[in-house]
Amino acid sequence: MSELKALSFPFIEQKEYFNFRKTGIYEKTNDRGEGTFGKVIKVKNIKNNNEENSNIFALKICKKWERSNEILSTEIMELSNLKEIKRINNPYLMKYVDCKINDKNKEIWILMKYYPIDLRAYFNDNLNKSNIINESFFKNIAFQILSGLNSLHKNKIIHSDIKPENILYDPQRNIIQITDFGLSNTFSFDIHHKCNLSGGTYAYLPPDILLGNLFLFTSLDIWSLGCVLIELCTGEIIFKGNNYLDVLEKIEDIFGPLKRLLPGYDILALKKNANLTKKECPGKGLINYIKKYQKIKFSNDDFYDLVSKMLCIDPVKRINAEDAMKHRWFISSS
């Protein structure tokens, strides 16, 4: 008689559950994505079997730490910041619903409201549809982001990693959520805070940071947002590069020699790249770049003026979030 073999049914998916003491048990529905520090999955609360959006959540599972007494510092920083952000209570800042340190699996779970798409994906899908993305819609999105940043900055928090993927969007409610606060920094001074920036995406970092400045201004977030707004209206990453020297070159292509624009800064990074130190000619110009690639039609030059103030090379002269919200682009009708 032939040996009996155990039958397996690969088409039957094993359900996965996550238990939180305060808010109950959640069932995994699908994966959303994975990044450097972990993955995000879509879950639903099994207490309610309806399919309403209010029952759907996003669960961030932070990667396992190697030693039993070691917890990922980035995630602990994010938990700390999320508690502060919940206190701030701005409608455009992502708040956590529940959190848990799972000692058994050596993971950190952060439960948040579910938002179906990020700004990069939404604009990539709809940028050429003028009936969906026009100046009025774009202006509303920009104002929401500035409102969130203004609340952070007034509470002495610098996000430090503003990019399209970290701004989620709900098309049904037309509301954004700034998320991913793992790199955020709190500062105790009204002007700046000295610390090491260990993360962030090069393409969205200002030249003063790329040149080695350790003083983090709130203007870091404003530069990043300026880059984001240009990307959303053009479909192009304006300062795309493989490393920080590439990004500095792209910045010089637009603005001209940084050694002239930031004479008081340590230009060690410039000395490492001959292409940067030899540049003498003026840049192509920010407004010229936007007008060349823009896919959103603007009624006047107000938007160009705002992003020019946001992408001011000197961080001290860069517009702040509160003043940006009062800019004439938001006041004028479009």
Predicted segments — roles?
Residues K39-W65:
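Glycine-rich ATP phosphate-binding loop
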Residues I56, I61-I88:
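Conserved N-lobe beta3->alphaC-helix segment of eukaryotic protein kinase catalytic domains
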Residues R87-D98:
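Conserved HxN/HPN-centered segment at the entrance to the catalytic loop
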Residues N105-D118:
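Conserved short submotifs of the Hanks-type protein kinase catalytic core
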Residues I141-A142:
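Activation segment signature within eukaryotic-like protein kinase domains
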Residues H153-Y169:
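Catalytic-loop of the protein kinase fold
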Residues K194-I209:
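Conserved activation segment of eukaryotic-like protein kinases, specifically the C-terminal portion
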Residues P257-L306:
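C-terminal lobe substrate-recognition/regulatory segment of protein kinase catalytic domains
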